[in-house]
Swiss-Prot record:
The keyword Protein transport applies. It comes from Buchnera aphidicola subsp. Schizaphis graminum (strain Sg). This is Protein-export protein SecB. Keywords: Chaperone, Cytoplasm, Protein transport, Translocation, Transport. Belongs to the SecB family. InterPro entries: SecB, SecB-like_sf. It is found in: Cytoplasm. One of the proteins required for the normal export of preproteins out of the cell cytoplasm. It is a molecular chaperone that binds to a subset of precursor proteins, maintaining them in a translocation-competent state. It also specifically binds to its receptor SecA. PANTHER family: PROTEIN-EXPORT PROTEIN SECB (PTHR36918:SF1), PTHR36918. One of its GO terms (biological process) is protein tetramerization.
Amino acid sequence: MSEEKLKKKSFEIQRIYIRDASFEAPNTPNIFHKKWDPEIKFNLSTVSKKLKPNIFETNLQVRVIVKSEENLVFLCDVHQVGIFFISCLDEQELKHCLGSYCPNILFPYARTCISSLVSYGSFPQLNLSPIDFDDIFCKNLKSKRNNFYQKENI
């Protein structure tokens, strides 16, 4: 690794891969004959960790649960992971990069995987909207600050 690379702010994608993907449609084939009135629940979370100096892993976990008339139609989980080289960022910049920028890179891959799994399950196409990870990161940061101050004031 070049010395110059370690002395300036740098970001590189080293690898993007699926760690885990699952699709469950426990009520098939009967669910295909029922009225289609989907209720979609969507959850996501990220976990990041340092693997080596300047090498970080971000795991974006996306879960979609679809019910129709109280019946589980399908459940889809995807853990989309990226390994990134990141150098010369201060602590706050690194947190922002791992909590917002990296998940933003990973989400289109996870969305494509989920869409494919749903299609292969013979269900109508599921197009997940883009996510504003920057907004989520800022809200979580603000919430953590508020919780910290509330605990300090007790």
